[in-house]
């Protein structure tokens, strides 16, 4: 097994390929990509034996923007016999001897064509899990050091990749997709983007400390209030900045103040630092990056989650430019900061970015 399979949104295979090629090279790992447009996954084959496993251990999954999941795989199994699909899969795993495995996930790419396989995948998981346990596998806790999850990626009927991923360096979600329910009281479906962003970027154990009823937030381009809703739900008082109307249900909470202003011109009150800045405005990504940079550098906010709408072409390059700009500006000012970005399931032609400023470096 010396390949990586990376799941992604259909249509973003080239961005995923460019990113894994760059990140692998930074670790001294080289290889080539096999991809099919709109397939929802890519294969990165390493030149050196053992390098795929090294990437699965050392390349931090949270650093990948476009990948929803990252697993080590071998050659594709094709034309699995209908009367016994399990034996060829077990045979591939026997070469690995995954004694430190915790569970099995039988998945597909997130495409309309592949989704037709999901019913089969669910049914197939039960006998496969039983067979793997008979081999003495799937016995470890997923929290055990060095434990791995076993993953099968069915790309079409009878054809699959057999693989694994380390539990401390992968998405915890089936197919890399969190299953979120749209709250009936939320003003718009965009609320799911911020909910997924918080789930992705903020450790669950820290969420109640990072969002409290003593905090204030600003939502730039807030109307009708999908993102504001997520902050208010967590107790934050929000200045909702937009010329449009906010949902009446949000006004009724008493936890928002509507500021009918231009999001690019709005400034917080002097000597008041905002805890959370959120922004989901439709604008050129570099213009949004400069706006967010201004808020952080001026000390107007401590933490921010925002979306960057991507162009039709050179999307990965545009992301690199925007993130490099923000990192460079914050470095110039001597800030300690953490920056993460992800192409979330609820994002479309956009990515979501999180930046937390932790103070300034000593001079």
UniProtKB/Swiss-Prot annotation:
NCBIfam families: PRK11760.1 (NF008734). It holds the Pfam family RlmM_FDX. Monomer. This is Ribosomal RNA large subunit methyltransferase M. PANTHER family: RIBOSOMAL RNA LARGE SUBUNIT METHYLTRANSFERASE M (PTHR37524), RIBOSOMAL RNA METHYLTRANSFERASE FTSJ DOMAIN-CONTAINING PROTEIN (PTHR37524:SF2). It is found in: Cytoplasm. The gene is rlmM. InterPro entries: RlmM_FDX (IPR040739), RlmM_THUMP-like (IPR048646), RNA_MeTrfase_FtsJ_dom (IPR002877), rRNA_MeTrfase_M (IPR011224), SAM-dependent_MTases_sf (IPR029063). S-adenosyl-L-methionine binds at residues 190, 223-226, 242, 262, 280. It comes from Actinobacillus pleuropneumoniae serotype 5b (strain L20).
């Amino acid at each position: 097994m010396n390949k990586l399979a990376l799941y992604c949104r259909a249509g973003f295979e080239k961005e995923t390929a460019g990113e894994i090629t760059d990140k692998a090279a930074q670790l001294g790992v080289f290889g080539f990509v096999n991809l099919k447009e709109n397939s929802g996954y890519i294969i990165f084959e390493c030149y050196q034996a053992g390098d795929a496993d090294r990437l699965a251990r050392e390349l931090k999954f949270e650093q990948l923007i476009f990948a929803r999941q990252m697993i080590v795989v071998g050659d594709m199994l094709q034309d699995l016999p209908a009367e016994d699909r399990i034996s060829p899969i077990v045979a591939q795993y026997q070469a690995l001897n995954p004694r430190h495995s915790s569970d099995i996930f039988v998945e597909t790419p997130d495409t309309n064509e592949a989704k037709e396989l999901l019913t089969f995948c669910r049914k197939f998981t039960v006998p496969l899990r039983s067979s793997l346990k008979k081999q003495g596998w799937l016995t470890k806790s997923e929290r055990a050091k060095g434990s791995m999850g076993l993953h099968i990626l069915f790309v079409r009927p009878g054809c699959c990749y057999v693989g694994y991923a380390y539990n401390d360096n992968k998405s915890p979600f089936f197919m890399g997709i969190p299953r979120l329910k749209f709250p009936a009281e939320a003003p718009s479906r965009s609320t799911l983007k911020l909910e997924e962003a918080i789930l992705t970027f903020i450790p669950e154990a820290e969420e109640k400390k990072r969002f409290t009823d003593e905090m204030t937030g600003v939502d730039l381009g807030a109307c009708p209030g999908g993102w504001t809703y997520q902050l208010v739900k967590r107790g934050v008082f929000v200045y909702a900045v937009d010329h449009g109307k906010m949902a009446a249900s949000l006004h009724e909470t008493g936890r928002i103040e509507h500021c009918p202003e231009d999001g690019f011109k709005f400034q917080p009150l002097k000597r008041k630092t905002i805890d959370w800045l959120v922004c989901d405005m439709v604008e050129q990504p570099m213009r949004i990056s400069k706006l967010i940079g201004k808020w952080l550098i001026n000390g107007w906010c401590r933490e921010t989650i925002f979306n960057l709408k991507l162009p039709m072409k050179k999307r990965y390059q545009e992301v690199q430019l925007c993130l490099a700009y923000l990192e460079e500006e914050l470095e110039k000012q001597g800030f300690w900061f953490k920056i993460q970005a992800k192409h979330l399931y609820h994002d479309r032609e956009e990515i979501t970015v999180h930046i937390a400023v932790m103070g300034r470096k000593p001079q």
